Curated annotation (Swiss-Prot):
InterPro entries, A to Z: IF_rod_dom, Keratin_I
Protein keywords: Coiled coil, Intermediate filament, Keratin, Methylation, Phosphoprotein
GO biological process: epithelial cell differentiation; intermediate filament organization
Region (Coil 2): 85-110
Protein's name according to its UniProt entry: Keratin, type I cytoskeletal 19
Further comment: There are two types of cytoskeletal and microfibrillar keratin: I (acidic; 40-55 kDa) and II (neutral to basic; 56-70 kDa).
Domain of life: Eukaryota
Segments for region (Head): 1-8
Annotated gene: KRT19
Amino acid sequence: FGSGGVFRITMQNLNDRLASYLDKVRALEQANGELEVKIRDWYQKIVLQIDNARTKFETEQALRVLDELTLARKNHEEEISALRADTERQNQEYQQLMDIKLEQEIATYR
């Protein structure tokens, strides 16, 4: 072979190894790109899940507040109804007393 043949074989060997390394680098870069896409997709999915959980929590809170307000409104309506009934009763008593007073005044003048 001679020194030129050994040099050429060594260079060919180094070129083959370099080509192999470059192929590995390209494959790793491609795999890295695919992983980045998967990570980005996973992150977006998690963000959506968090947003959905937040929305669900806020909706549940709003429904709780709505239930509390509905109950409070019902209680107020019952109180108003009781007050109306009491007012009507007092009005009737007042009217009866006024009728009695009127009858007494008429009786006084007879």
